[in-house]
Amino acid sequence: MSIIEKSIEVNVPEYKAYAQWMKFEEFPQFMEGVKEVTRLDGKRFHWKAEIAGRNTEWETEVTAQAADQRLAWTSRGSVIKGCVVTFHPLSSAKSKIMLQVEYDSQGSAEHGGETLEAVSQRVQGDLERFKALIEKRWRPPGRDTIFDNFPM
C-alpha cells in the first residue's frame, strides 16, 4: 500500500468546499476518468470510471464524517482502498483542502493499471479541477460591474 498526499488552497470558506465535496454525484465534473457516482444509501456509493483505458466499477462506504472538517471512505473492488479529505480554514474566505489516498500499487500492477506517479498526478489534477469548479460556483457577491458605462 502507498499513501498519496496532496493539498490545495481554495478561495472559498471551508464549509462551502466541504458542502461541494459532499456531492459525490458531481465528482465526474472534476475527477478524471470518473463517469458516474450513484448513491446506494446514506453511506454507500457505486462508482463507474475509465482508468488506464479500462472500464471499472467499485463501491465506497463513508466511514467517518465531521461536518465542514473531515470525510473518510473505504473502497471495495478498487485499487484505491480509501480516502480522507480534510478542510482547514485559512481566513473567512479561504481554506486548504488536504487529500490522502490509500493506493494498492501492487494490485494495480497485477491488473495492468496506473503507476503510483500517474495516480499521484491524477489526484493533483482532480484537486485543481475541484478548485476551478468551487471558485466559479461560489464567487463572492458584490464585486461585479453591473453597468459598463455608468457615469460617476
Positions of PLM-derived features:
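Beta-strand/loop substructures that line and gate deep hydrophobic ligand-binding cavities in soluble
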Residues: 64, 72-132, 136, 141-145, ...
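Non-transmembrane, membrane-adjacent beta-strand/coil modules in membrane-associated proteins
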Residues: 54-55, 70
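Short, surface-exposed coil-to-beta transition loops
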Residues: 3-5, 55-59, 80-84, 96
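Hydrophobic ligand-binding cavity/cleft-lining segments
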Residues: 1-44, 129, 133-135, 149-152
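Generic recognition of short, well-ordered alpha-helical interface segments
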Residues: 29, 57, 122-125
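Short acidic, glycine-rich loop/turn motifs
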Residues: 49-53, 75-77
